[in-house]
């Protein structure tokens, strides 16, 4: 073990030599290798390799964008962008674009302001114009109806009188002459209708001898009533109430003719006294209507005559 081979001794010697050589070369201050010397790169600022390989300078260059943001707030680039980011400048600045673009919000009130004035005029004028006419029309129509109702109270068939004349209230108003004339015209229309109906019965055939006689007499009587009513309307419609003598004479004639028409209606029905068939009921239905209207018309004529006589 204490004995080494020559080969081992040789290897050990070489190793020791190499170690010594390496140690001496690293500790030598006179080494001229510029690439391994740390002092020249840091001390020489003008050397290109240290500047390009220096790790400290690249970071400031790459981080330089972070430093500019603080200074720019006072610079113009941020002041030009401040309107879009900062809401206070647009509101404070009257010449800024946003307020002028929002200014249309004020025109709507201006455009709506004209719409508020129109409502007051229409509401006031239509109501003021319609209220007098509607109230006047309602009052006038009610007055006319009251006049007809009061006038019909003197008739024998009050309901028939009012129902037949009330549709003509606006024409009659409070005029007793028009009231009498319209009453006569309604009576004449009913008499013509009854005369036509009775004539159709006589032409129908199938009647008994008594029915034929009664129908023929009735046709004649109603015909006379129609004539009397027509004469009465003609005279009453053109009467001059200012001439009292003429007025009294005409009114006397009218009263006589209308009374005769009423008598004719009664005579018509008297002819069916011996008839017990349905024909009598049919004729009676029409003739009775004429007789009642004639009776009412005669009462209104008498009222008109007495009113004018008292006035004279």
Swiss-Prot record:
The keyword Nuclease does not apply. Residues 1-25 form the signal peptide. It comes from Arabidopsis thaliana. It comes from the Eukaryota. Residues 24-36, 44-55, 76-85, 93-104, 125-137 have a biased composition (Low complexity). Pectin methylesterase (PME) inhibitor involved in the maintenance of cell wall integrity in response to necrotrophic pathogens. Modulates PME activity and pectin methylesterification during infection by Botrytis cinerea and contributes to resistance against the pathogen. Disruption phenotype: No visible phenotype under normal growth conditions, but mutant plants have enhanced susceptibility to infection by the necrotrophic pathogen Botrytis cinerea. InterPro entries: Invertase/methylesterase_inhib, Pectinesterase_inhib_dom, PME_Inhibitor. The keyword Ligase does not apply. The lineage of its organism: Eukaryota, Viridiplantae, Streptophyta, Embryophyta, Tracheophyta. Residues 56-75, 105-124 have a biased composition (Pro residues). PANTHER family: PECTINESTERASE INHIBITOR 10 (PTHR31080:SF118), PECTINESTERASE INHIBITOR-LIKE (PTHR31080). SMART domains: PMEI. It is found in: Secreted, Extracellular space, Apoplast. Disulfide bonds join 152-161, 218-268. Glycans are attached at residues 141, 153, 185, 200. This is Pectinesterase inhibitor 10. Residues 24-141 are annotated as: Disordered. GO terms for biological process: plant-type cell wall organization or biogenesis.
